[in-house]
A protein has these predicted regions:
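A glycine/proline-hinged amphipathic helix-loop "lid/cap" segment
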Residues: 1-55, 209-210, 290-298
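Gly/Ser-rich "nucleophile elbow"/oxyanion-hole loop immediately N-terminal to the catalytic nucleophile
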Residues: 123-138, 158
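Hydrolase active-site cap/lid region
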Residues: 153-211
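Gly/Ala-rich beta-loop-alpha elbow adjacent to hydrolase catalytic centers
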Residues: 140, 144, 148
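Proline/glycine-enriched tight loop/beta-turn segments at coil->beta junctions
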Residues: 44-48, 55-63, 226-229
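Short beta-strand/loop motif that positions the catalytic acidic residue
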Residues: 234-236
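Alpha/beta-hydrolase active-site loop
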Residues: 106-128, 288
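Short amphipathic alpha-helix adjacent to the substrate-entry channel of hydrolases
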Residues: 78-98
Length: 298
C-alpha cells in the first residue's frame, strides 16, 4: 500500500516522510564508498552539502549529478540515499547528490542556486574522483527533474559547467497548472493537482504561479529559447498530473534541435516505481540505467 501524500501541512508531510523512511531497510552499500563533503554555496548563502557515491567497480570516467525530488518542499539526501546507492552500482558511475535548501523557507532561486553551486564544485573536482568533467549527466525525478531542466538552462546561459546529458524523470516544469492532465488528476496517488498548487505557491510565493513574471529557470516550460541544451531523456507516467507538461517540454526541446528521447509509461502514476515488483516499474528502472550508460558512452 502506497502512503497518502498531502502537502497542505508541509511540516506534517515532512514528519510523515521521515517516519516512513525510518521503517525502510538500510541499503547494502557493499562496493560503494559514500562520503559527505561541504562545498561553497551561492554567493552570500550557506555552504552546500554533497554526498558522493563512488563504486569500487566503475564502467568509465563518468559521473551523475543527482537532484532529489519532493515538490521543492520535501526530501533530502537521506531520502534519496538508497536510490543513489543503487544508481551508482547499476550504472557504474560516480554519483553526487546535493542537499539544497527547501521552499517555502528558501524559495526560488535558492534551491536552484544551491544545485548549481554543487554542480560547479563537482565539475571542478571531477578528476579527483576519476571523472571526466565532459562526461557528467544531470539526473532528477519530479521536482528534481524540474530543477535539472532549470540547471541545464542556467549552465548554458552562464557558460558552464558542461553537461553531457539531462535525465528528466516526470519533471515538474510548468507553474501554470493548465494542462489537461493537471486539470484532470485531482486525487491521484502521491502527486495530484492540490499538491502541485502547494508546491508552486511554496517555490514561487503565493499569487506568483501563473503570472507573467515567472522565470524560465524556475519553470522551464516558460523558456522561449531551448537551443544549445544537452541531449535529454524525458519520462512521463500515464496517470500523473505532470504528464502533459513533461511531454510538452520534451517536444519543445525537440523543436529547438535538442536530441530527445521521450517516453510515456502506460498504466503508471507519479511515483509508481515505488511498487518495485511491478513489471512496468522494473522496465522503467532498467531503462533508466540503460539510458544513462548509453548517454555517457559506456
Amino acid at each position: 500500500m502506497l502512503p497518502t501524500l498531502d502537502v497542505s501541512d508541509i511540516p506534517a508531510a515532512r514528519a510523515t516522510m521521515k517516519e516512513l523512511r525510518a521503517g525502510l531497510p538500510v541499503p547494502d552499500e557493499t562496493g560503494i564508498s559514500v562520503t559527505d563533503v561541504t562545498v561553497p554555496g551561492p554567493a552570500g548563502a550557506p555552504d552546500v552539502t554533497l554526498r558522493i557515491y563512488r563504486p569500487d567497480e566503475v564502467t568509465g570516467p563518468i559521473g551523475i549529478y543527482d537532484v532529489h525530488g519532493g515538490g521543492f518542499i520535501l526530501g533530502d539526501i537521506d531520502a534519496s540515499h538508497a536510490g543513489n546507492v543503487a544508481l551508482a552500482r547499476a550504472v557504474g558511475a560516480v554519483v553526487v547528490t546535493v542537499e539544497y535548501r527547501l521552499a517555502p523557507e528558501a524559495p526560488f532561486p535558492a534551491p536552484l542556486e544551491d544545485a548549481y553551486a554543487g554542480l560547479v564544485w563537482f565539475a571542478e573536482h571531477a578528476a579527483d574522483y576519476g571523472v571526466e568533467p565532459a562526461r557528467i549527466a544531470i539526473h532528477g525525478i519530479s521536482a528534481g527533474g524540474g530543477l535539472c531542466a532549470g540547471l541545464a538552462l542556467l549552465a548554458r546561459d552562464r557558460g558552464g559547467p558542461a553537461i553531457a546529458f539531462q535525465y528528466l524523470g516526470v519533471p515538474e516544469v510548468d507553474d501554470r497548472l493548465t494542462t489537461p492532465s493537471m486539470t484532470a488528476f485531482t486525487d491521484t496517488p502521491i502527486w495530484n493537482r492540490p499538491n502541485a498548487i502547494v508546491s508552486w505557491d511554496s517555490y514561487l510565493g503565493e499569487g506568483v504561479p501563473g503570472s507573467a513574471d515567472v522565470s524560465p529557470y524556475a519553470a522551464p516550460a516558460r523558456a522561449t529559447d531551448l537551443s544549445g541544451l544537452p541531449p535529454a531523456y524525458v519520462s512521463t507516467m500515464a496517470f500523473d498530473p505532470l504528464r502533459d507538461e513533461g511531454i510538452a517540454y520534451g517536444l519543445a526541446l525537440l523543436a529547438a534541435g535538442v536530441p530527445v528521447e521521450l517516453h510515456l509509461f502506460p498504466g503508471t502514476f507519479h511515483g509508481s516505481t515505488l511498487i518495485e515488483g511491478a513489471a512496468i516499474s522494473q522496465r522503467e528502472i532498467t531503462e533508466r540505467v540503460a539510458v544513462l550508460r548509453r548517454a555517457l558512452g559506456v
